[in-house]
Amino acid sequence: ILLLVPTSYFIYHWISEETISDITPGTLGGELILSDGKSFNLSDNNLPENAVRAFVIDSKGINYQIPANKPQVKEIQNILRTLQGMECLITLSDGTRVHLNAETRLTYPVCFSSKERIVQIEGEAYFDVAPDKEHPFIVKTSHTSIRVTGTSFNVRAYADEDTESTTLISGTVRINSGNEEFELVPNQHYTYNKNTGTN
């Protein structure tokens, strides 16, 4: 279903700020799960950092800062999981900013090194994607694939809900739900029904 809809509170709260990175101190909360299975609470101060896990954590969230002179490495996947009542902002290695709503799980590479920038999400998040026409950004949910080059949009895909939805704020996105593909324009809303397999 494609609809023109008012902006939800979650989206409006973040795009109405002077900048998306202005997160109020104290809202940071969640768990970082590294590729080796080790997990850390974001409030801890003893998080590891090495050549392929170069990040800074502060009151604004997680900011990946991969040095330009580091050799290209295979894509190592980390997971950021927010807890109930918590939110978190993460800046990925390409500069894309993702604001995770409560009870959301984002799987992403520490450093994008392939032709496509691919992340996976379960829950709800607002994406402000860094433009890069040569390396499309793809967000995968359990039932859809959202392809962009540089744009802002919201994805809601909680496992315990009957639908998945995408709301486009700016730019364009293409959504693939199996045999069908849709292109959204700003302020357009896409919904996929998991029970019926229909859009």
Enumerate the language-model features and the residues they cover.
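Conserved active-site beta-strand-loop modules that form the wall/rim of enzyme catalytic pockets
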Residues: E164
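Propeptide (latency) domains of metzincin metalloproteases
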Residues: T167-L168
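Short acidic/polar, Gly/Pro-enriched loop/turn segments located at secondary-structure boundaries
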Residues: L2-E161, R174-G197
